[in-house]
Amino acid sequence: MTGSIVKTEDISSISGRGDTSQSPEEVEESLRLIEDLKFFLATAPANWQENQVIRRYYLSNDEGFVSCVFWNNLYYITGTDIVRCCAYRMQKFGREIVERKKFEEGIFSDLRNLKCGIDATLEKPKSDLLAFLYKNMCLKTQKKQKVFFWFSVPHDRLFADALERDLKRSSTGSQPTTRAVSEPALSFRWEANSDVSLYDQITNHVDSQRTDSRPSTVGAQDVTQKQNNRVTDTPVSASKDVEPFESNVVEDEVQIVDNNKMCYGLPHSESNNYVPQQLIVPQSDLERNELTNEFDELNADLKPSDILTSNQEDDDFPLDYFPVEIEYSQTSMDSSLHMASQGAKHPSQMMFYEDMDGMMLGPKYPISAGIYEDPFFREEMAASNASKYMMPPPMSATRAHFMTNGEYYSKSREGKKHGKSGRQHGPDDGRRDYDNENVGSSPSENQNPNEELDATENNQDADDNRSPDIYPPTDAMANDEYIPAYNRRMQMSESLVHPYTGMMLNPYMFCNMLAVDPSLNMGVNPVVDPFYGQNHSMDVAHDVYSPQEVVYPSNYRSTPKAAYFNMRSPYGRNFPPPSAMNPYYTPYHRRQPSSATRRYFSKANLINRKSKSPPRKNVVSKPSHKAPKKVNRTRHATSMHVGLGGKDSGNTSSESRDDSTKEDSN
């Protein structure tokens, strides 16, 4: 090959006869470019960058680029690029495309054999993939079409079928889509009756053209004029001038020179003026080394002159430049904190890690050394805000969830007057009587008016004696569910639960500070699960409060779970009625919001039952469908009722006078 680099698409020129004449080097260059394209088609999906989406290969000015696209973890090639590859190979083979449209139709007809889902994917019009391919000039339109998988396209088979169609048209006298214009297509003879396939015949012919190429029959002047008129459009060909080809001149073979012996930047004549550097070793050092004989056996025959001619790999950065020393502590660990002798250890007693063999490190190691792992989480060591487990105030269906400001202040004033006398009533304190089964009747219907006023005053007293706060009384929490946090530890020692709280020790030493299982001495199971209300600052409380006689776990409950939560299990034999169980606070399924204006909704399981208490003032109540009965009362009866009642309030007497006045007027 010559020293000049020739552009691929400009290696041929058309003579007066219409045929193309090439030099053997140009034919070899064409075949090499075909091999380069085949290499790209085989290895394009390899060695991609992290965010790379497309990889291109330049064909020529006419064909442009062929692209490999990475989309949805798959590599694709378009039908347009497949046609470009076939056309490019046909031109480099030496056949010029005469009818481009008919040539493309033949290749697209062969591509119909590649089915969707197996060898290709069918994209919708103007999809994201088609839009990307169209922007990168891989497609001519964004219509609905197939995009082929990269390794599913048989490029060699498509090229051989296209060439076979043209050769058959030429043999039958039809107009072919391509015609032979240069080597190796001019010298190729197709044997249709041969057992060898067309592609194998092409391969054998190309191999023969590489080894025994025909000499050019064109004169030297024509070739010189051809190369001078050549248009160069690549950086390589533009940077170097193409030397004219001279016939009957055999060039000398190119000598391969080692890169290490080449002189860069200076001519050969000027490079001889410089003297290479030499390593100068003092004679005293050599004599001292010879006298002491401290050379190693492997380096005994090493001479200073060998350093200059040594391999470059030996001049790498030495690995022993930085001295590496491993220090092992010779001091024994402090064994003064042994809780048991080495011989007395039992496998059941070693509940902790045996990394330190049941010992702690001495004071010579600081805490910041981080020898021990932290067995605790930081959020578990944070002190809680409350030292006692307290349930939130239960939501009740027997009282309203909403309270106006007037009700709150009125209850506060009444509570100051009466004190806490309402606490001494029976268990039915604060509950109203719902024995009246007449849902639609008024409060005064079917009743004696004197009894109505008595019930009204009694209900008002019951409402006044009720405590306004919504928290349960103190005795309501005196059950096993509300055991304080300090009593839950029971007989557990402070040092066993939190060994680093009362001692000035490192918390990282907790795993290895005990050699004996603490549960053997305690007699109880420690509470290992965290619970609400546990406070590290209250660990000394067990010294003040004596432990209980019976030890309960943290999740112990004195009442059955079904009765506690009022949950009806489907596995029970009998279905208990709601009245059979009386939980000491309202269950979850009964915590329903009630109305602030219609107070009779506040009782659970009792709806639309009116209470006996009179309606509140300044509140508009819904009228009843039934007209109330008019009851004629005399002033004497009213005064007798007030005297028997025992409580003469200003509001009650004024209301009775107003009622009697209205009745007298009627």
From Swiss-Prot:
GO biological process per UniProt: regulation of pseudohyphal growth; response to pheromone; sexual reproduction
Primary location recorded for the protein, binned into one broad class: nucleus
Name recorded for this polypeptide: Protein STE12
Pfam families, per database record: STE
Start-end of Basic residues biased regions: 414-423, 623-638
Alphabetized UniProt keyword annotations: Activator, DNA-binding, Nucleus, Pheromone response, Phosphoprotein, Transcription, Transcription regulation
Region (Disordered): 1-25, 205-245, 409-477, 605-666
